[in-house]
């Protein structure tokens, strides 16, 4: 059985890890980075690039570079009014679903996420030297059912069997507690502020058991929001100074975003930073430059409400877990945004102690996912992970009321049944409206799905007995059934992702992804063949120039013809032809080497074979008095004191 890899599919960056020698190892990508930007770019040549190469084209090609797609996955188009304005690429509705429009071709958020997952899969395969087909993928703890299902679909499109969807804070706690002294029980809080989401989880650790007591969060709060505040400030300041509105210029906006992220990162270690963007735009008077100084105090002032938004989820999580802040032994900091000094201040304020920096905030989640992969694969023993469902699940009952069947922070997997009845006399069917959320009325919560149970015998209201059962699996994905206890009729529903991807659409995307992977492989093969050919032409021409007068005219002509043929082949995209003609030139070029060795032999003595026999002698015999091959002679060594040389 192959390895089960762990993937942290992040908003800003992604990371992949695997268990090696009983420990989780973070795998560097082909560019050498331990994390990979979660960015997909489409070049002017219709090629697709992922990671750093995609990030490199963000400024020059903003409309064809997709980033922060995790903020959209599993959402309906109507839920994204504010988010849509923040990105330069085009997002359009397809029914209720979200699609990303790249030159008229529509991509689902799952497909874009799958391209990132494929990059992580390839990174792991290059490292392990074997095909990878199974993965554990992490999601924010506060992701709802639709977002979890959409993430699972993305894995399937990428050619991965998703063995488990695991919550990011839980994964980080695994990385923190793995192989530690497991006898001592600890209560920890995981404060996870990433690029697009915020989670807080309270866990109890001890004797190999990792039990989540409560979780809370905000799936629309992360580093991107802090960057946007700086961008808005820069736009306003520049407009005040010049009268020019940069928010209408997509290329300028992308430069501002990069500068804002850089400024935010710098302000974690310095009190003041400069934002310098020469030639940001131009008007009739010539080019304009942007130069602004930003202090940490000013940054914290403009983002104060964002920092405040992390406090309430922390208080709710503590309340749901039934513990006070003083009972927390450690606070783990996860996600790059936790490096901001203000975050450390907030943690001290809420929990009364400093946050722990014992795990790498960028890598801990992927490492925890790899450990979970090890547990599922049987490589890791004596570790039990007990997670919870982040939101209450229930149905709509009479009067539009939301009736929860499974309350938030219930340990999963779990199953719960409740008996309901009809609301009207003679009712022969009931419509089950499945919801997720914490509000009292059904309309205020998120619809997961609807289904009907039909064929109920007519009876007075309140007489039929309809048993509704909720089943949440270990991935946090919901299955619901309704059964008429009188007739035994039953109806099941597996809540599908609100992305609306059908099985046939997912299968089509899987096939497209496989075809693209094959195309990528062929493209790489072609590039390597061309590089080898170029290198051989250069080397052969150089040698021909130096040794041309030492080989016969016929041989020289043959080599030059082979070079010309290969040059012509390079103008085409026929990899097989390039390889064949490279081989022809290689064979022809051997003639040069042959002539060189012949002439060296001739110079060494009248006998043309003298050189080669001397060469053989040199390799096996150091002379009549030296040691012979295959024997071991005693040698005296003299120790030299070289202290004076130091």
Swiss-Prot record:
Q: Which top-rank group of organisms is this from?
A: Bacteria
In the record, what terms sit under GO molecular function?
ATP binding; ATP-dependent protein folding chaperone; unfolded protein binding
Comp. bias regions, Polar residues: 610-628
Which residues are recorded with the post-translational modification Phosphothreonine?
Answer: 197
- Could you list this entry's UniProt keywords, alphabetically sorted: ATP-binding, Chaperone, Nucleotide-binding, Phosphoprotein, Stress response
Pfam families for the chain = HSP70
Q: Which InterPro entries match?
A: ATPase_NBD, Chaperone_DnaK, Heat_shock_70_CS, HSP70_C_sf, HSP70_peptide-bd_sf, Hsp_70_fam
The identity of this protein, by name, is Chaperone protein DnaK
User: Where does this protein come from, organism-wise?
Assistant: Treponema denticola (strain ATCC 35405 / DSM 14222 / CIP 103919 / JCM 8153 / KCTC 15104)
Lineage at the top is: Bacteria, Pseudomonadati, Spirochaetota, Spirochaetia, Spirochaetales
